[in-house]
Amino acid sequence: MTNIRKTHPLMKIVNNAFIDLPAPSNISSWWNFGSLLGICLILQILTGLFLAMHYTPDTTTAFSSVTHICRDVNYGWIIRYMHANGASMFFICLFMHVGRGLYYGSYTFLETWNIGVILLFATMATAFMGYVLPWGQMSFWGATVITNLLSAIPYIGTNLVEWIWGGFSVDKATLTRFFAFHFIFPFMIAALAMVHLLFLHETGSNNPTGIPSDTDKIPFHPYYTIKDILGAILLILVLMLLVLFTPDLLGDPDNYTPANPLNTPPHIKPEWYFLFAYAILRSIPNKLGGVLALILSILVLVIMPLLHTSKQRSMMFRPISQCMFWILVADLLTLTWIGGQPVEHPYIIIGQLASIMYFLIILVMMPVASIIENNLLKW
């Protein structure tokens, strides 16, 4: 009798995706982040569900309902901090996952890559709306500043902003709709992630060499299931270290002050994982220009396959491109640092230079480095 996992309509899908899936024999730990993102998403949905049971999306009670969760609900504090720090872990895994894709040329799987970019945008939108929900000072002013950016759109901008707000300022209507969207988006992300996986399994995984591995495949289970479990243990270890020892390390102290429309905080800044994009936004003196640069800083990922001028897929055997890649990483870290600093000298000029460098490396230096390497191969 054939095994049920190979015949049952539902089990067959699971089997082909996680058990009998042919995987390259040489994929490194950089390939762990996909499964870690899945774990993060499940964790966020579960903790979020339990938080939603006690949260009230109303301007008068939102802040106190979060306090109530932390003080009065059984293990509410751990659920709240797992959700808040889980978002940070989610973005760490996301950045690693995207970085891996850039380094090893995984963006040549066009459909998988483009859905990945959509997933990145959806996750960023979800995180932004979630940050508004506790209704602290940074929640309110973050929502005001970021939604206000849409007013830079010519002609329809102002109407669009007021439509999103549901009034003439960030208020009760805004909070209620953000809660509704924050609840539904993760399920859309889960659906998109399944499509992401579907397209990936059409081609099979890439590997560090970038060379087709059809001649050397191994079953996903037990080899990569055990490897993914190790990754998951480390992820949960780091998350719980954050939650139990320094739960507020990555948060903003201003968010422990209830939202007050009459009092602007001295430094309005988003969560750490948006600081690089925020720095790019602030580095352009023009409002519309800044908004475009902000969107393009992420959207540039879509054209990565067009910018691939190398004859090799991966950067494994391309030292000049490797150099460019790590300069880009350093540049992103610089932008992240600048995004958290006040708008004054010397931070303004550093931010502007880092922003120019960001686009210059991706659009010019990396493709040129690839062409140089192609020519070096002829020698």
UniProtKB/Swiss-Prot annotation:
Gene Ontology annotations for the cellular component aspect, listed alphabetically: mitochondrial inner membrane; respiratory chain complex III
CDD domains: cytochrome_b_C, Cytochrome_b_N
Annotated residues for binding of heme b b566: H97, H196
GO molecular function: metal ion binding; ubiquinol-cytochrome-c reductase activity
SUPFAM superfamilies according to UniProt: a domain/subunit of cytochrome bc1 complex (Ubiquinol-cytochrome c reductase) (SSF81648), Transmembrane di-heme cytochromes (SSF81342)
BP-aspect Gene Ontology terms: mitochondrial electron transport, ubiquinol to cytochrome c
Binding-site residues for heme b b562, renumbered to this chain: H83, H182
Transmembrane feature ranges: 33-53, 77-98, 113-133, 178-198, 226-246, 288-308, 320-340, 347-367
Cofactor(s) it depends on: heme b
Keyword vocabulary terms for this entry: Electron transport, Heme, Iron, Membrane, Metal-binding, Mitochondrion, Mitochondrion inner membrane, Respiratory chain, Transmembrane, Transmembrane helix, Transport, Ubiquinone
Cofactor note: Binds 2 heme b groups non-covalently.
Pfam families named among the record's database cross-references: Cytochrom_B_C, Cytochrome_B
Residues the entry annotates as binding a ubiquinone: H201
Localization per Swiss-Prot or TrEMBL: Mitochondrion inner membrane
InterPro entries linked: Cyt_b/b6_C, Cyt_b/b6_C_sf, Cyt_b/b6_N, Cytb/b6-like_sf, Cytochrome_b, Cytochrome_b_C_euk/bac, Cytochrome_b_N_euk/bac, Di-haem_cyt_TM
Membrane topology, as annotated: Multi-pass membrane protein
Additional facts recorded: Heme 1 (or BL or b562) is low-potential and absorbs at about 562 nm, and heme 2 (or BH or b566) is high-potential and absorbs at about 566 nm.
Assembly and interaction partners: The cytochrome bc1 complex contains 11 subunits: 3 respiratory subunits (MT-CYB, CYC1 and UQCRFS1), 2 core proteins (UQCRC1 and UQCRC2) and 6 low-molecular weight proteins (UQCRH/QCR6, UQCRB/QCR7, UQCRQ/QCR8, UQCR10/QCR9, UQCR11/QCR10 and a cleavage product of UQCRFS1). This cytochrome bc1 complex then forms a dimer.
Family to which the UniProt record says this protein belongs: Belongs to the cytochrome b family.
The protein's role, per its UniProt record: Component of the ubiquinol-cytochrome c reductase complex (complex III or cytochrome b-c1 complex) that is part of the mitochondrial respiratory chain. The b-c1 complex mediates electron transfer from ubiquinol to cytochrome c. Contributes to the generation of a proton gradient across the mitochondrial membrane that is then used for ATP synthesis.
Protein name listed in UniProt: Cytochrome b
Top-level taxonomy: Eukaryota, Metazoa, Chordata, Craniata, Vertebrata
Gene coding for it: MT-CYB
